[in-house]
Swiss-Prot record:
Homotetramer. Belongs to the glutaminase family. GO terms for molecular function: glutaminase activity. It catalyses: L-glutamine + H2O = L-glutamate + NH4(+). It comes from Cronobacter sakazakii (strain ATCC BAA-894) (Enterobacter sakazakii). The gene is glsA. PANTHER family: GLUTAMINASE. This is Glutaminase. Substrate binds at residues 66, 117, 161, 168, 192, 244, 262. Its EC number is 3.5.1.2. One of its GO terms (biological process) is glutamine catabolic process. Keywords: Hydrolase.
Amino acid sequence: MTHTLNNELLASILEQVRPLAAQGKVADYIPALADVPADRLGIAVCTVGGECFAAGDADERFSIQSISKVLSLVLAMGRYDDDEIWERVGKDPSGQPFNSLVQLELEQGKPRNPFINAGALVVCDMLQSRLSAPKQRMLEVVRNLCGAPDIIYDTAVARSEFEHSARNAAIAYLMKSFGNFHNDVITVLQNYFHYCALKMSCAELARAFLFLANQGRAPHLDTPVISPVQARQVNALMATSGMYESSGEFAWRVGMPGKSGVGGGIIAVVPHEMSIAVWSPALDHAGNSLAGIAALEILAREIGRSIF
């Protein structure tokens, strides 16, 4: 028996998963994220029909971190031909931690996909080549997508990440040695960390990502964000690579394209129907929100939704 999607259902799901927040660990390798209270918990759902539902801390903004990798890819898709993107970054799951150098070395500096750090850095390098003000352009895109003109970067988080960026810099320089990184590494890293430091709420994320459930169109915008084919491609990448080395487990448990961030957020998509955002800062071993995944698993079961 499936249940009707409403605020009460979402609130009930949050209460079921709340104990999991005590079992995870808030990201502490980025000092500015370590101060976020582990008990925060929110969820929001937007449908292509124009309805939005929410529960918990759905309006509190947090650092979206790697969820931004989807947005930077979408931005690049509007400025490059397909073959220009995919000759520099792959479309396959990595099976490795998101900041691994080993696979990158073995595979001649071409990242497996755009959602691991190496792949996202290549995408940011591409944006640096085509945009005069990449950070400002990303802000404009995000503000338009979610209808919130006051979306900002958390500069303290961006600065904190830059001060602890040795591994990401190593990834970028390794790719540069293989000829797969064209701009100044420091400049691109600063853009990348600002994208990760976007502050958004669950409600804003659900609205912003609705275009992926609606064949590339945001219902409130006149022009498509990306084409229907590109929307399908992004959803496919999220389904196979969006949750780092736990992407298979997420597909098994939840059955939706999803993308996580170490800020504790997860965005999920039911094509042709809805976008969902959850937030709980306590993470599992792979850097995914423990309570967030559990909430999505219960929601998928309760409303009878899966892409499989």
